[in-house]
């Protein structure tokens, strides 16, 4: 999107999960940033893993169709000790990415630490605030 002399970009950020999928939309224009939406999809009440994946896909598509983002930023996989949890998380990430790819939206993965640091302007202590 382009308006006058300053480029405008909408970014959909996704923190995928099978219990809670966090998401936020921002509009960046020059050096200013505007929050469009910050929310979460609660999935804890559903026991069927495949239903959760379907809901993640549908919500991601709904966000894309509503806000028409220029790109998607998604939290990259991290390595944990529980293999089953990692597989479920990987599927959630893949489903969210597939939704973006189906609409031909560029996707960039960021490490969890990089995302937390960006949200806090370099203050590690701020991670607790991001979590809330």
What are these regions (language model features)?
Residues 1-132:
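Phosphate- and other anionic-substrate recognition elements at nucleic-acid/protein interfaces
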């Amino acid at each position: 999107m382009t308006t006058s002399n300053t480029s405008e970009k909408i970014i959909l950020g996704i923190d995928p999960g099978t219990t809670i999928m966090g998401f936020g939309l921002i509009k960046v224009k020059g050096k200013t940033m505007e929050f469009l939406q910050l929310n979460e999809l609660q999935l804890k009440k559903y026991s069927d893993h495949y239903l959760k994946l379907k809901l993640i896909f549908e919500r991601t598509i709904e966000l894309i169709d509503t806000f028409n983002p220029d790109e998607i930023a998604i939290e990259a996989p991290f390595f944990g000790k529980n293999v089953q949890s990692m597989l479920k998380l990987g599927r959630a990430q893949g489903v969210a990415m597939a939704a973006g790819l189906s609409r031909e939206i560029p996707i960039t993965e960021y490490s969890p630490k990089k995302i937390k640091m960006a949200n806090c302007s370099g203050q590690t202590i701020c991670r607790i605030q991001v979590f809330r």
